């Protein structure tokens, strides 16, 4: 009988990536297959996020639902991972004694041993340690699921922004070696992946070891990834302005595989608030980065994170944020009302902005961003956009869907053989959350890099002399 695994994931793309690795790992070691139905599962894993308000209560609410499944079948194993697990540790079992496994983001690779221990001893396992980058050496080869893929290049963060729990839950910055990253991406490319998104809490802080023992920069890594056959688009998230150096900007100037879209969080337009947040950069320094980026790549579009209602934020501070939003002309944002995360310095600050004022500021900010995003979309009307076709449209099974370089979803009529390939689409309609277009050019007509295997080249060029000896002419 097939053993089944159910994983519920909350939070960032790093968590999504980690969950996919858990599934691959447990299929390899224990033969588990994924199921969307918790009631069918032999193992239930909750991959948690501690960024949002009331994260802990959300976890215990979900565990309460799973408790009934455990009562019906005591052999079901329940595990809690992710940042809440890292933050709370044994306290989770204080409130939920039926939880069998508690593991952190850096110990998910030990899940097979933890499961075996629970089955063998019927005793719980807690491992929320921070072994340096060990998990990547223990995970199976990557498996592609479509033409896009996420690849984690580093873990943790050293910035210690006053509102953020990441350094406490994922540890300090540790970079994967460049060879490991390039190998993983090459394996994905061999399975048909065309676009890769490099992941890290502070991705441009990557300083990984090269094959010769030297230390590479993030700009070096971007160029290495761009040279991999089959990879035609590169994205990365998330960046920090303080380490967005000129050598990265130069990659935008000379590397077309790097998309014309960047998520670069600023959080606030007020230097006073930025200082209280521990951001170590000013609004002017942020604008200088954007100015240099647009000199290197004039069509680049920028998105950001914003926190409104941070302790001590005045109306004038908020107006400076709105001024920055207009000056940079952000295309998109992830914006939130401040809520204190336990254990962070900001949790000890006086939360003196009234809740209604926070909500009003958030509404004003999001409305402005939405207006700017719509203006960006309208500029695309009548233009030709290169789309990576991801699959069937959510709006109609008779249509295909894909994304532009600037992360717009485009729906269009096409044939199934286009999935996983690029098409050029003329934008004919603009909607708030998507675009519509018509195909004007397929990948075969684009003249993209031709990727051939060594075997096909040898087969095509093999010759034999009069003695029957094979010779090869490239």
UniProtKB/Swiss-Prot annotation:
Residues in TRAM domain copies: 378-441
UniProt EC number: 2.8.4.3
Cofactor: [4Fe-4S] cluster
Keywords: 4Fe-4S, Cytoplasm, Iron, Iron-sulfur, Metal-binding, S-adenosyl-L-methionine, Transferase, tRNA processing
Residues where [4Fe-4S] cluster 1 binds: 12, 49, 83
All residue ranges annotated as the Radical SAM core domain in the record: 143-375
EC supergroup of this enzyme: transferase
Catalytic activity: N(6)-dimethylallyladenosine(37) in tRNA + (sulfur carrier)-SH + AH2 + 2 S-adenosyl-L-methionine = 2-methylsulfanyl-N(6)-dimethylallyladenosine(37) in tRNA + (sulfur carrier)-H + 5'-deoxyadenosine + L-methionine + A + S-adenosyl-L-homocysteine + 2 H(+)
PROSITE patterns in the cross-refs: MTTASE_N, MTTASE_RADICAL, RADICAL_SAM, TRAM
Principal localisation: cytoplasm
The MTTase N-terminal domain, residue ranges: 3-120
Binding, [4Fe-4S] cluster 2: 157, 161, 164
CC per GO annotation: cytosol
SUPFAM superfamilies given in the database record: Radical SAM enzymes (SSF102114)
Cofactor note: Binds 2 [4Fe-4S] clusters. One cluster is coordinated with 3 cysteines and an exchangeable S-adenosyl-L-methionine.
Subcellular compartments: Cytoplasm
Keyword Iron: yes
One Pfam family cited in the UniProt record for this chain: TRAM
PANTHER family recorded: CDK5 REGULATORY SUBUNIT-ASSOCIATED PROTEIN 1 (PTHR43020), MITOCHONDRIAL TRNA METHYLTHIOTRANSFERASE CDK5RAP1 (PTHR43020:SF2)
HAMAP family in the record: tRNA_metthiotr_MiaB
UniProt subunit comment: Monomer.
Assigned protein family: Belongs to the methylthiotransferase family. MiaB subfamily.
Protein's job: Catalyzes the methylthiolation of N6-(dimethylallyl)adenosine (i(6)A), leading to the formation of 2-methylthio-N6-(dimethylallyl)adenosine (ms(2)i(6)A) at position 37 in tRNAs that read codons beginning with uridine.
Protein name in UniProt: tRNA-2-methylthio-N(6)-dimethylallyladenosine synthase
Organism: Cronobacter sakazakii (strain ATCC BAA-894) (Enterobacter sakazakii)
Taxonomic lineage of the native organism: Bacteria, Pseudomonadati, Pseudomonadota, Gammaproteobacteria, Enterobacterales
């Amino acid at each position: 009988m097939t053993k089944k695994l159910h994983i519920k994931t909350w939070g960032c793309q790093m968590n999504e990536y980690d969950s996919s690795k858990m599934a691959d790992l447990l299929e390899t070691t224990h033969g588990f297959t994924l199921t969307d139905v918790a009631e069918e599962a032999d193992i239930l894993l909750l991959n948690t996020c501690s960024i949002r308000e009331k994260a802990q209560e959300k976890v215990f609410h979900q565990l309460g639902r799973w408790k009934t499944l455990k009562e019906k079948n005591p052999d079901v194993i329940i595990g809690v991972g992710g940042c809440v697990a890292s933050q709370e540790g044994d306290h989770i079992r204080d409130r939920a004694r039926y939880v069998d496994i508690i593991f952190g983001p850096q110990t998910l690779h030990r899940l097979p041993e933890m499961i075996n221990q629970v089955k063998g001893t019927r005793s719980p396992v807690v491992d929320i340690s921070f072994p340096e980058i060990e998990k990547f050496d223990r995970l199976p080869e990557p498996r592609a699921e479509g033409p896009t893929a996420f690849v984690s290049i580093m873990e943790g963060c050293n910035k210690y922004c006053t509102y953020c729990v990441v350094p406490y839950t994922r540890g300090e910055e540790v970079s994967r070696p460049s060879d490991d990253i390039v190998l993983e991406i090459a394996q994905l490319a061999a399975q048909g992946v065309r676009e890769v998104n490099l992941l890290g809490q502070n991705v441009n802080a990557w300083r990984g070891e090269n094959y010769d023992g030297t230390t590479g920069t993030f700009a070096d890594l971007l160029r290495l990834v761009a040279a991999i056959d089959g990879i035609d688009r590169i994205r990365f998230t998330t960046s920090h302005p303080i380490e967005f150096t000129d050598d990265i900007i130069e990659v935008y100037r000379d590397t077309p595989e790097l998309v014309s879209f960047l998520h670069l969080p600023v959080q606030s337009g007020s230097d006073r608030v930025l200082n209280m947040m521990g951001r170590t950069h000013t609004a002017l320094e942020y604008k200088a980065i954007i100015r240099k980026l647009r000199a290197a790549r004039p069509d680049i579009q920028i998105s950001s994170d914003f926190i409104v209602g941070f302790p001590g934020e005045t109306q004038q501070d908020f107006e400076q944020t709105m001024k920055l939003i207009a000056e940079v002309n952000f295309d998109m944002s992830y914006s939130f009302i401040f809520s204190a995360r336990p254990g962070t310095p900001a949790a000890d600050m006086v939360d003196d902005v009234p809740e209604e004022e926070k909500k009003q500021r958030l509404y004003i900010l999001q409305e402005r961003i939405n207006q700017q995003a719509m203006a960006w979309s309208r500029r695309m009307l009548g233009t030709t956009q290169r789309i990576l076709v991801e699959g069937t449209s959510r709006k109609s099974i008779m249509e295909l869907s894909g994304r532009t370089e600037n992360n717009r979803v485009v729906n269009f009529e096409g044939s199934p053989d286009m999935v996983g390939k690029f098409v050029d689409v003329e934008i004919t309609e603009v909607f708030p959350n998507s675009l519509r277009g018509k195909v004007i050019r397929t990948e075969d007509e684009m003249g993209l890099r031709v990727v051939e295997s060594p075997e096909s080249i040898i087969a095509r060029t093999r010759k034999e002399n009069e003695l029957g000896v094979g010779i090869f002419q490239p």
